[in-house]
Amino acid sequence: MAMCEVCGKKVAFGNKVSHSNKKSRRTWKPNVKKIKVLLQNGQRKRIYVCTSCIKAGKVVRA
């Protein structure tokens, strides 16, 4: 679910590092919202879009 359908941003993986430098796996999830978008053919569709794409104006809200 956590994937932007506009830019393809998805879950990133890495390490959580403690003060004693112990490492354990963790994930970073993108801030994805489900919004209604107006497509080029005039159709309305509900898709997952990250907030950076919404802020940049890459999608037109319906």
Swiss-Prot record:
InterPro entries: Bacterial_rp_bL28, Ribosomal_bL28, Ribosomal_bL28/bL31-like_sf, Ribosomal_bL28_bact-type, Ribosomal_bL28_sf
Gene3D superfamilies membership: Ribosomal protein L28/L24
GO cellular component, one term: ribonucleoprotein complex
Keyword Glycoprotein: no
Record carries keyword Ribonucleoprotein: yes
Pfam families named among the record's database cross-references: Ribosomal_L28
Name assigned to this protein: Large ribosomal subunit protein bL28
Organism for this UniProt entry: Caldicellulosiruptor bescii (strain ATCC BAA-1888 / DSM 6725 / KCTC 15123 / Z-1320) (Anaerocellum thermophilum)
Entry keywords, A to Z: Ribonucleoprotein, Ribosomal protein
GO molecular function, one term: structural constituent of ribosome
Coiled-coil portions: none
SUPFAM superfamilies hit by this protein: L28p-like
Taxonomic path: Bacteria, Bacillati, Bacillota, Bacillota incertae sedis, Caldicellulosiruptorales
Entry's family note: Belongs to the bacterial ribosomal protein bL28 family.
Example GO biological process: translation
